[in-house]
Design a protein with these regions (language model features):
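Glycine-rich nucleotide phosphate-binding loop and flanking beta-alpha elements
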Residues: 12, 73-74, 154, 168, ...
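Active-site nucleotide/adenylate-binding loops and adjacent lid/helix of ATP-dependent enzymes
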Residues: 4-5, 90-91, 103-189, 208, ...
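A general structural signal for well-ordered alpha-helical segments in protein cores
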Residues: 12, 51, 75, 79, ...
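Conserved, structured core segments of small domains
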Residues: 296, 305-313
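Short, charged, surface-exposed secondary-structure boundary motifs
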Residues: 38-41, 102-108, 223-225
Length: 313
């Protein structure tokens, strides 16, 4: 079979490496390859955000499976584009629909999904430019620290934690008035600050069944000692040393299963990775965020721990 990987980073290199080592007969193609992938996959030049360009490559290379690495094509609806085009609708897409991708594309959408499905998470409020005065009043009437999140995608940099009201108001204005993160901060979610240790849970979902992959812990902050602004990821480790059987059981029963049931109940087209950002609060897991694709750098430490043939999972 011919399989196209969309993306050109270390995550996609990890996908290619794992699939290359499959016992199944897979011809690998990868968009805009990096030096590490040229030895194991054929590079195809694609503008991954131009879906007509993706279509041409699918047809030209007789692609049967498309595995999407980064979030932006998913948020922009690449799944829907492929499935709604009669020329290429036969292609299996590993990734959710545009509607499902809002779990990552909109913090407010994700929070509402969690609330509807009784999934433990921090309390929150959301505001846009029309309600900025209410947001400022909310900050003044509550105790810091505050967590401010751009509603839309911001490459892992749209979360700001502030320790005082003045800084919170300053950052809020930068996001809503000055468009600090472009359209992604047209709306801002203000969350309860949770104290605990963060970790990541990865689930592979086929629309009905799921498998939990190895857990990981990533380090987002740019400075030494886990300080400074968030990045897309400075590094990652797996296994997670504080993850015991009791915590695993709680994560599956209280978070993974309700997430899966919610996707099915709400008829959300979703086949692919569910990346659940968690925080362990005194032995009780809560969801910080959903991502609708595999993590990077997490893929680099998770996939080497998978002993199974990935094409058989």
């Amino acid at each position: 079979m011919n399989l196209l990987i969309i993306g050109s980073g270390a995550r996609e290199h990890t996908f290619a490496w794992k699939i290359f080592n499959s016992k199944q007969n897979v011809s690998l193609f990868i968009s805009n390859s990096n030096p590490g992938t040229t030895k194991i996959a054929k590079s195809v030049s694609i503008d991954i955000n131009n879906f007509s360009d993706v279509k041409r490559s699918i047809i030209k290379n007789s692609i049967q499976i498309v595995l999407i690495g980064p979030e932006i094509p998913l948020i922009n609806g690449i799944y829907d584009f492929i499935k709604n085009d009669s020329d290429i609708s036969y292609v299996n897409v590993i990734g959710p629909s545009k509607y499902g991708a809002q779990l990552e594309g909109s913090k407010e959408f994700a929070k509402k999904f969690m609330y509807r499905n009784n999934i433990p998470t921090a309390s929150y409020r959301s505001y846009d430019i029309s309600s900025i005065d209410d947001a400022i009043l909310f900050l003044k009437n509550n105790e810091p620290p505050f967590v401010l999140k751009a509603d839309g995608p911001a490459a892992g940099k749209g979360v700001i934690i502030v320790d005082n009201v003045n800084d919170a108001i300053h950052n809020l204005k930068e996001m809503l008035i000055d468009s600090r993160f472009g359209d992604s901060s047209n709306k801002v979610v203000i969350e309860e600050f949770l104290t605990g240790i963060e970790m990541s849970c990865f689930v592979l979902f086929d629309g009905i069944n799921y498998k939990i992959l190895p857990y990981a812990k990533d380090y987002k902050r740019i400075g030494e000692g886990d300080k400074g602004l968030n990045t897309g990821g400075m590094g990652s480790v797996s296994p997670v040393n504080f993850l015991d059987i009791d915590l695993k059981d709680k994560i599956e029963k209280q978070i993974v299963i309700p997430t899966i049931n919610g996707l099915i109940k709400e008829k959300i087209d979703y086949v692919g990775f569910i990346f659940i950002g968690l925080i362990n609060v005194d032995g009780f897991p809560k969801v910080i965020e959903y991502n609708v694709r595999m993590g990077d750098p997490e893929a680099q430490v998770v996939f080497p721990r998978i002993e199974n043939d990935f094409m058989e999972i």
